[in-house]
Amino acid sequence: MNFVFISPHFPYTYWQFCNHLKQNGVQVLGIADAPYDSLPNELRESLTEYYRVESLKNYDEVYRGVAYFAFRYGRIDWIESNNEYWLEQDARLRTDFNVSTGIRSDRIRSIKEKSEMKKYYAQGGIPTARQIRAAEGQEAVRQFALQVGYPIIAKPDVGVGASGTYKIEDDRGLQRFYDEVGDYKNYVAEEFITGEICSYDAIIDANGNALFESMTVWPPSIMDIVNLRLDLSYYVDREIPESLRELGRRTVKAFGIWNRFVHLEFFRLDSDREGLGRKGDFVALEVNMRPAGGYTPDMINYAHSIDVYKIWADMVAFGESQTQLGVQLYCAFASRRDIYQYLHSHEEVLARYGDRMVMCERMPELFSAAMGQQMYTVRLQTMEEVNDFVSFVHDKKL
């Protein structure tokens, strides 16, 4: 089997996908724009061959890389990056090289555009926030806001995270949005929903069935964390509620997902919401056809005593995985920003949680706006311990 892995060096931990593919007898063929000597040793040892391009954004260059691999090794069976940024290019490459193991260009809108996602949620009978395209005009959006109530959220139709997101509180704020955002036609506006963000993180086989499922609980507003420079914490739950499991599986079926690691986001309502559900119910937010960001796959491993990199590679190579869950724990992440003075020193955090700490490091600059500069990740038995850990890391000096 020939597997072309696009950008296998980023995020850093993706070498583990490549390593398990190699262990499963797959030829892993890497394409990226980083010098070969800069690749981690673990990645270099996992690749059959590496093709460097000047820029991964140059489709012609990447195309030539895949063509070279096809000439040298024969038919390409898989093309994948597991990276949001390259999903559209991955689909185009699959289309051009007739690779049928993943999404092609004719399906890409359904997983990239928030406005398109709504159609599939509706087909699956999955509750989701009401939405309108900003391109319909200011008055149409104002009428929408009167219907669902201010505030509303405006965000790019294509995009992830908090980048380019606006919380609009009233008609004056709506006017400012249209005055100041030059590309407003590429935005959607949604009703503002309050509650925890919970993700259904799963590995889906060729038949659309889940080989592995987990839940991660995120802060309610990454936008506020970035804009207000707040501290970040989140955790992987030791269990997944049956209601989220059922909604996650329905979403997979509605979108026709197969052969993928998915990160499907839902709100868990913190109050009754007419037309959507009661407090504690899950409401769909958006789909992401790749693993959760940062070190979340590793946190999932620590929470469930498992290896999702291996499960995914088993899915690719064999269509199944025999990996069994181990001890179930919470895995919690909390980070700090260098601009703040904290009540407990770095050394005190290590002294208190060192025996349960699984990761402790400085965050890459690319992630620091959302995730801070110093992170701590621990395995814990109870939700009370999770809350105590977050408080201990985040409490500040007066």
Show the residue positions of the predicted features.
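A conserved helix-loop-beta module that forms one wall/lid of the active-site cleft
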Residues: 94-164
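ATP-binding N-terminal substructure of ATP-dependent carboxylate-amine bond-forming enzymes
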Residues: 1-106, 383-397
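Short acidic-hydrophobic, aromatic-tinged amphipathic segments that line or gate anion-handling sites
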Residues: 50-57, 132-136, 166-169
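ATP-dependent carboxylate/phosphate-activation module, predominantly the ATP-grasp catalytic core
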Residues: 172, 191-257, 261, 268, ...
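Conserved ATP-binding module of the ATP-grasp superfamily
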Residues: 127-131, 151-154, 163-199, 221-232, ...
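Peripheral (often C-terminal) accessory segments that flank ATP-dependent C-N-forming ligase machineries
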Residues: 311-398
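Glycine-rich phosphate-binding loop signature in dinucleotide/nucleotide-binding domains
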Residues: 69-76, 146-148, 182-184
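Short amphipathic alpha-helical segments and helix-helix/interface helices
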Residues: 15-22, 118, 142, 178
